[in-house]
Amino acid sequence: MRLAAASNEAYAASLAVSELLSCHQCGGDRGQDEELGIRIPRPLGHGPSRFIPEKEMLQVGSEDAQMHALFADSFAALGRLDNITLVMVFHPQYLESFLKTQHYLLQMDGPLPLHYRHYIGIMAAARHQCSYLVNLHVSDFLHVGGDPKWLNGLENAPQKLQNLGELNKVLAHRPWLITKEHIEGLLKAEEHSWSLAELVHAVVLLTHYHSLASFTFGCGISPEIHCDGGHTFRPPSVSNYCICDITNGNHSVDEMQVNSAGNASVSDSFFEVEALMEKMRQLQECREEEEASQEEMASRFEMEKRESMFVFSSDDDEVTPARDVSRHFEDTSYGYKDFSRHGMHVPTFRVQDYCWEDHGYSLVNRLYPDVGQLIDEKFHIAYNLTYNTMAMHKDVDTSMLRRAIWNYIHCMFGIRYDDYDYGEINQLLDRSFKVYIKTVVCTPEKVTKRMYDSFWRQFKHSEKVHVNLLLIEARMQAELLYALRAITRYMT
């Protein structure tokens, strides 16, 4: 009997300790592992994005079969549910297409071996100093049997991959300078030469990861908890803090102050939305009343192209790449320069002469079957995606605005649509929005939360993520057009 009583007392004491250490909301234990000498990492950020408060992230209910299927597919393909996926899920139709395309590029049958694919992803992401993507693909590269020595620097990779460095550099920062000579140098490099099919696969991977770096910075994607910069071993500052508090809105004081400060300008941002709606209505009326001549539209394109040179942010300083990223590429000083620099003449790229639908799509599909169709589907979803809403307004036709954003990006790259009136861009896109667009597309490593917050202040975060989807797909298409045109010229 005494043994039974002692056992009951020990059990009761154990329950009392567990009660003290457990969280009443999630049932988890606090501190027990630390007492056992185990260092437990804690996430540094609150949720998958530094720009979007976690309480405003899309919550997936247990009844949402489509979302759960997407998450399951992502986890099965990548072995993880990364923060990019958790932000893109605002737009499930796009996310499904994105995951399908990325899975095909990285894991399905194709011209390049698996470890080459991940290494090219590392090279592309490193050009924009995107340590988030570099870290993810370093893990994937090693997982598929890649040689760890290659990760010590590009000079330790095979000469064939080193030769790709020049194309990676120009494609990432000044794609309009790509010529058929770049292509010829890769295809005729003796024992280190690329086949046409391999090169198309590499080009698609490079453009995919240049653009994904833009999304990563543009949405302020936080590092995964297991990656550098994603965790800390310091104890929380509040003794009764639990990890479940993150999902309950227990954010830092600074974040709450930022949110309250943002509310002060609600009335101003409300009028911005109304003004944009009115401009769209007026432009639609003008379209119906009169149409500009071809000469006038060509003149407006040149004017917009020149004006885009003077769009830059006050934070437009050089960003020195960290050693752990810069070792994956050469010529670290090479970066973006405006298409229309003084003393430098580059002919305008006319979509009428070479376009994705009539030329690029068929070339990619011929040399890398099925990929052209996947990319084309992704372009169309991003371009046509709409919920017919603008901030608090419903039943709005946003096609005019989406086209202005897409064509402005292509204009910055010197790409012109003969049937588009570029005068609409200045009417629809204000300076703060142009600064954000140009930074995300051309120098994404310089994007700040202030830039993200300063444009379309009354719009929902899901709408800003939608903008970023437009930006990255327009950028990817622009890069592909220049690279594929050079390949076509080499072939003919």
Swiss-Prot record:
UniProt free text on domains: The N-terminal domain may have an alkylhydroperoxide reductase activity. The C-terminal domain mediates interaction with GATOR2 through which it regulates TORC1 signaling.
Tree of life domain: Eukaryota
Subcellular localization(s) per the UniProt record: Nucleus; Cytoplasm
Binding site for L-leucine: T386, Y387, N388, T389, T398, E463
InterPro entries, A to Z: AhpD-like, Sestrin
EC supergroup of this enzyme: oxidoreductase
Native organism: Mus musculus
PANTHER family reported for this sequence: P53 REGULATED PA26 NUCLEAR PROTEIN SESTRIN, SESTRIN-1
GO molecular function (one): L-leucine binding
Region of interest called C-terminal domain, as start-end residue ranges on this chain: 321-492
Null mutant phenotype: Triple knockout mice lacking Sesn1, Sesn2 and Sesn3 do not display an embryonic lethal phenotype since they are born at an expected Mendelian ratio. Moreover, they are not distinguishable from their wild-type littermates. However, their survival at 10 days is dramatically affected. This is associated with a constitutive activation of TORC1 signaling in the liver, heart and skeletal muscle during postnatal fasting, that occurs between birth and suckling.
Pfam families membership: PA26
Principal subcellular localization: nucleus
Listed name of the protein: Sestrin-1
Transmembrane segment boundaries: none
Keywords of the record: Cytoplasm, Nucleus, Oxidoreductase, Phosphoprotein
Reactions accelerated catalytically: a hydroperoxide + L-cysteinyl-[protein] = S-hydroxy-L-cysteinyl-[protein] + an alcohol
Protein's job: Functions as an intracellular leucine sensor that negatively regulates the TORC1 signaling pathway through the GATOR complex. In absence of leucine, binds the GATOR subcomplex GATOR2 and prevents TORC1 signaling. Binding of leucine to SESN2 disrupts its interaction with GATOR2 thereby activating the TORC1 signaling pathway. This stress-inducible metabolic regulator may also play a role in protection against oxidative and genotoxic stresses.
Protein EC: 1.11.1.-
Modified residues (Phosphoserine): S293, S314
Known partners and oligomeric status: Interacts with the GATOR2 complex which is composed of MIOS, SEC13, SEH1L, WDR24 and WDR59; the interaction is negatively regulated by leucine. Interacts with RRAGA, RRAGB, RRAGC and RRAGD; may function as a guanine nucleotide dissociation inhibitor for RRAGs and regulate them. Interacts with KEAP1, RBX1 and SQSTM1; in the SQSTM1-dependent autophagic degradation of KEAP1. May interact with PRDX1.
GO biological process, one term: cellular response to amino acid starvation
Family: Belongs to the sestrin family.
Catalytic residues of the enzyme: C130 (cysteine sulfenic acid (-soh) intermediate)
Region annotated N-terminal domain, chain positions: 71-252
UniProt tissue specificity: Highly expressed in heart and also detected in liver and skeletal muscles (at protein level).
